[in-house]
């Protein structure tokens, strides 16, 4: 049985063949998903998702709700707020 830290499903199990011919299980972190819009669920453009060592403020666009909602949703919300 693996030790308690490796029993979590947040780690991905990968079967690896060793040079000696045995098959062992390696535990890896799961791949991160693409940032998505909170309203529509579509992938966000403008997010620099390749650079994870920087914070969200560096990666996200510098507009209001940048990195949270898509530009189309934001434009629609601004139009709605102005017209009311």
Curated annotation (Swiss-Prot):
Organism domain of life: Archaea
Full protein name: Large ribosomal subunit protein eL34
Family indicated by similarity: Belongs to the eukaryotic ribosomal protein eL34 family.
Pfam families documented for this protein: Ribosomal_L34e
BP GO annotations: translation
Gene3D superfamilies according to UniProt: 6.20.340.10, 6.20.370.70
Ribosomal protein recorded as keyword: yes
Keyword Cell division recorded: no
Keywords from the UniProt entry: Ribonucleoprotein, Ribosomal protein
GO CC terms, sorted: ribonucleoprotein complex; ribosome
Molecular functions (GO terms): structural constituent of ribosome
């Amino acid at each position: 049985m693996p030790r308690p830290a490796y029993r979590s499903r947040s780690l991905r199990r990968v079967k690896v063949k060793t040079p000696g011919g045995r098959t062992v299980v390696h535990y890896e972190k799961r791949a991160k998903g693409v940032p998505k819009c909170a309203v529509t669920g579509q992938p966000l453009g403008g997010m620099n998702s390749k650079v994870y060592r920087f914070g969200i403020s560096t990666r996200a666009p510098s507009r209001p709700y940048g990195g949270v909602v898509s530009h189309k949703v934001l434009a629609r919300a601004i139009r709605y707020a102005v017209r009311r």
